[in-house]
């Protein structure tokens, strides 16, 4: 019997076309044991760090993640922009939505002044007078791609923003400032947010040119008990922007993968409506998975971990196997719609035994 190519297995799971088994993604360790390999699109500031690695100290947008030595990615402690960049009249060399200007372009009726990216240490972001959009830096950003593609073989090639959209906005403005911007500074918020969205659209075009199969978004909308902002406000401010990005991804031939931490059941149907192909519910322990299945099973492909707050940390291998079966039963179908997700989380207390059990749990599943 011929084994199905791994990229084909993933595609069939996403599109409900009967893969031969449940695909598995190993996220941060042992990636070649899985069906998907991840390529990091984020860069450091020019001259800081290397491509396809998180070894930079200052991100290309200008934010700095302070590491605490516990193995996590770190936390932003200083906003890049203490004041919102001023808005100006339309900039003539920026692109607009229109049939002759390409899909996914963002209108430029009011924009912050834009300066070329330079070393943030000599910048004047605190004045609120300019906003620096990262350069595409395609040659540098794709410098690790040839070796990555060779390593991929027949695996699915997933390009990741690493952190995207809303999360980037909160890093630039600081979380408290960002939350106030949504209500008190709607025009300034829109101007800055659209620059972020526009840059991500350019990265998607680049990823498609280089032969990736999917694009990965990472925004956290949930807390342990509900959303950070109200669903109506999310639908007003963010849903239309995501819809434009997902439509562009599909025009480019890319699947859309969306990661979200926290409890966000109220907007999961919205993500399906606007074109998310793979929804990663990162914390199944705080979401009503049975309710999610009733709403979306058979229509939405899910990428699911064994909870790295509960079962994969404190459970036994038998508990982990049972949880994988439960998630698959509630969300998967014989035609597909389910991808297993394995992440090494010793920083959260995950044992080596339980890490290995997570991979084995998904290997045991059958569509």
PLM features: residue spans?
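Active-site loop segments of alpha/beta catalytic cores
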Residues: 1-25, 29, 84-367
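Helix-coil boundary/capping segments in enzymes
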Residues: 31-89, 107, 121-122, 126-144
